[in-house]
């Protein structure tokens, strides 16, 4: 086994602590947070209790668990009705937890009404051209002293300065995050052996839904919307935890 294979095997082991690959109620492949991921979000938060918490792209609501005893109101938002049905079943005995179906951009919450926002394995699915609008919305409803806690797939290094690492990460993510049938039929046969793929090539040749965002891009958009990244906890070069506050 070569160095690259050893490294990628370690990535898989590290990710398994935080991410579960499951089949959603509507039959889709989905990635859900583990209890350890949820606990890590709570540990990262400056708020150990509060009034209102919002989970963006909540899925089955697993990331909410450690926060439920400590917040007066918790709201989970997701596009999938099937995911929300599962989440509602899990939290049916918790009167302070409710769920809404819809896009993050369409949230109908009062200005500066949320203490903490959390999001796990969701925001990377938003195309960059839509990300600024999402950030504007979040900035409006987050309290001035509030925070956004994020656990997600994100290129945490500068991909243009470390092409060999990006190539390894890119190949790994394509193989492990795209639907298996899509990867085997439309991606794997066209990957060139010995070629070092660059971030620019990824942007040029990969459909938007399969592209990977870099932290340096996201930081720029966050800053434009009035946010700043206060803390980064790296798990792998492409997955970690971010604490984001208003600038």
Language-model features, listed with the residues they occupy:
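Conserved class I S-adenosyl-L-methionine
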Residues: 1-48, 50-57, 62
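Class I SAM-dependent methyltransferase SAM/SAH-binding core
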Residues: 60-106
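A short glycine-rich, Lys/Arg-flanked "PGG" loop and its adjoining helix->strand segment in the class I
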Residues: 132-144
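A short acidic, Gly/Pro-enriched loop at the edge of an enzyme's catalytic core
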Residues: 109-117
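C-terminal alpha-helical "lid/dimerization" subdomain adjacent to the S-adenosyl-L-methionine
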Residues: 151-221
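A short SAM/SAH-binding and catalytic strip from SAM-dependent methyltransferases
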Residues: 116-129
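Core SAM-dependent methyltransferase catalytic element
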Residues: 225-247
């Amino acid at each position: 086994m070569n160095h690259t294979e050893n490294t990628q095997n370690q990535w898989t082991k590290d990710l398994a602590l935080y991410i579960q690959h499951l089949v959603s109620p509507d039959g889709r492949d989905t990635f859900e947070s583990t209890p350890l991921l949820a606990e890590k979000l709570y540990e990262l938060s400056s708020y150990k209790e509060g009034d209102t918490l919002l989970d963006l792209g909540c899925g089955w609501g697993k990331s909410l668990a450690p926060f439920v005893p400590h917040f007066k109101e918790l709201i989970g938002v997701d596009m999938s009705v099937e995911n929300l049905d599962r989440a509602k079943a899990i939290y049916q005995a918790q009167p302070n937890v409710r769920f809404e179906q819809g896009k993050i951009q369409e949230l109908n919450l009062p200005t500066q009404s949320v203490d903490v926002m959390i999001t796990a394995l969701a925001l990377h699915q938003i195309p960059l051209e839509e990300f600024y609008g999402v950030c504007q919305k979040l900035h409006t409803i987050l309290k001035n002293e509030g925070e956004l806690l994020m656990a997600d797939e994100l290129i945490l290094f500068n991909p243009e300065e470390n092409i060999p690492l990006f190539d390894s990460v890119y190949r790994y993510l394509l193989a492990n995050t795209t639907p298996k049938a899509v990867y085997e039929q439309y991606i794997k046969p066209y990957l060139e052996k010995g070629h070092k793929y660059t971030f620019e090539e990824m942007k040029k040749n990969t459909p938007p839904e399969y592209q990977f965002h870099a932290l340096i891009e996201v930081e720029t958009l966050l800053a434009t919307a009035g946010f700043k990244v206060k803390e980064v906890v790296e798990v792998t070069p492409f997955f970690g935890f971010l604490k984001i506050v208003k600038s």
